[in-house]
């Protein structure tokens, strides 16, 4: 299939490996586009041009566009830089005022940061001429893209794009008073209802995505089932159960090039399924590095995770 006839997919997210990585989202954003391209899609990434990237990758970018968008009652600058890296095209949204410091500012400042990003994504794609068939939105920071497309950009060339919203973690939803969404993006107050964006005491990026995205997905089939239960839905069980037929649980894959024990430069001894002797030696080296006593036959268990209750730390004894 030629690229001209390929399914055009634009993946939007706050972080992407190897450029900026604070969590598992970055791994998905950094590997999924390449895999999609290998099966015939034309998949590209759009993300903020964080200050952490500019020193190492800034010289490799090509300027594609600059324009102003309507944001928070005024006109706000957007620059678009293009980076081709590891066979994938990346579009980087540049604005020092929003992406010149922390990737996630926290609180109201983070809401403003990513409300800006959501509008910038839509207008940038249109202005540079990459009109996707599908916009793949990841986590709450991109959650306003579907509602903006549906309610404010229907007359634009990008207005017919379908959206899929992937839930990486239900716990974080981008909750703010609806007046902020109205101020930032001019979202109509009629959407400040439980049917649309409102959930209990506030509105949220996440609720908007759950209602307005054409399809929903999660990081595993099990998680897709779990989040319909009030214990794991974080007060979104109503809409998640209503949209169960539109929700797909797709198991996150593993980057077998990076995480390959036969070639991984970060482990002292290599091994494979036919010869596990190197794995035993790696275990001994790890025990030494941790200052633990070496006791044959006793397993050592490691967790690569945030130190939060949600990750099951209570199960580690």
What are the language-model segments listed below?
Residues 1-317:
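Catalytic cores of nucleotide-sugar-dependent glycosyltransferases that transfer UDP/GDP/TDP-activated
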């Amino acid at each position: 299939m030629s690229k001209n006839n390929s399914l055009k997919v634009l993946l939007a997210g706050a972080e992407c490996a190897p450029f900026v990585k604070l969590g598992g989202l970055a791994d998905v954003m950094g590997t999924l586009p390449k895999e999609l391209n290998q099966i015939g899609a034309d998949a590209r990434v759009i993300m903020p041009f964080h200050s952490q990237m500019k020193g190492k990758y800034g010289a490799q970018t090509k300027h594609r566009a600059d324009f102003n968008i309507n944001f928070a009652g005024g006109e706000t600058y957007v620059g678009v830089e293009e980076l081709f890296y590891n066979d994938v095209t990346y579009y980087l949204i540049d604005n020092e005022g929003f992406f010149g410091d922390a990737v996630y500012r926290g609180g109201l400042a983070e809401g403003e940061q990513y409300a800006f990003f959501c509008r910038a994504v839509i207008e940038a794609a249109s202005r540079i001429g990459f009109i996707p068939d599908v916009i793949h939105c990841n986590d709450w920071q991109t959650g306003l893209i579907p509602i903006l497309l549906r309610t404010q950009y229907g007359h634009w060339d990008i207005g017919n794009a379908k959206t899929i919203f992937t839930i990486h973690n239900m716990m974080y939803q981008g909750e703010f008073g609806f007046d902020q969404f109205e101020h930032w993006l001019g979202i109509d107050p009629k959407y400040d209802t439980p049917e649309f964006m409102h959930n209990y005491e506030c509105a949220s990026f996440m609720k908007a995505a759950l209602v307005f995205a054409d399809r929903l997905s999660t990081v595993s089939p099990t998680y897709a089932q779990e989040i319909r239960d009030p214990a794991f839905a974080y007060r979104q069980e109503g809409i998640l159960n209503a949209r169960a037929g539109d929700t797909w649980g797709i198991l996150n894959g593993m980057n077998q090039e990076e995480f390959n024990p036969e070639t991984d430069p970060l482990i002292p001894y290599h091994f494979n399924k036919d010869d596990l002797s190197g794995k035993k030696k790696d275990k001994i080296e790890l025990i030494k590095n941790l200052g633990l006593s070496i006791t044959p036959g006793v397993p050592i268990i490691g967790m690569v995770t945030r130190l939060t209750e949600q990750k099951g730390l209570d199960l580690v004894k």
